[in-house]
Amino acid sequence: MTPGNPPAVVFDGVSKSFGAKHVLNNVSWNVPAGEALCILGRSGTGKSVTLKLIIALLKPDQGKIWIDRDEVTQLSGPGISRVRRKIGYLFQDAALFDSLTLYENLALPLERLTQKPKKEIDFVVDRVLGQVGLATDKAKMPSELSGGMRKRAGLARALMLEPKILLADEPSSGLDRITASEIDELLLRRKAEQKTTLIVVTHDVNGARRLADRVLVLDRGETIAHGTVSEIEHSENETARKLIGSNV
């Protein structure tokens, strides 16, 4: 943790169940602003649910969640919308509208959520497309984009409102190693240049090693390790050591 760096996200005793299935059980952790946290764990251990709790798509059954000093578990309506404006979300799927061009997909949130004139929207779209390496592709339809291009487009969309916190759900899923590494580099560049806090759910241990300042390891809905990659490698928990040592 960087001294003096306030936490961007805090989970305090958070639990979440779906019926009789306990997905998260009394989970507590935080990530300092401007750092990268990678969340590792087997399938079904609550990783993606954690992201949905951060963006308030789900509510915890117990515990508190703070986003940039806002206790989101106490917010509703306009308060939730205000917090969500601080967060970008890179889904596993790029979440693009198939009937719109790439430009139209990226311009849409600015048109709906801001009062920016078209000229300024054009400038922002062009700038972000340049940042993700799609500067010449804005007239393309989503069906014309390769898997790597769709992932870049999804990242561009997540960045359109200049989020302070960027959530990424399996950013390397379905990509070859070279393309996955390129996506990781884009995320790291964003972190370095804009001091964006990254929270990345991944099964890709190599990606976690590239990205993470700290790693959170979940197993059966509980935190079994939380620390640097080196600390996880030397954890007393055998499952945590295995998860950081090989792809799962």
Where do the PLM segments sit?
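Conserved ABC ATPase signature
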Residues: 141-145, 149
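Helix N-cap at the start of a conserved alpha-helix in ABC-type nucleotide-binding domains
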Residues: 177-179
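Conserved ABC ATPase "signature" region
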Residues: 71, 118-136
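A short, proline-enriched helix->beta-strand linker immediately N-terminal to the Walker B motif
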Residues: 160-164
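Catalytic Walker B motif of ABC-type/P-loop ATPase nucleotide-binding domains
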Residues: 166-169
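Helix-to-loop junction immediately C-terminal to a conserved catalytic motif
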Residues: 55
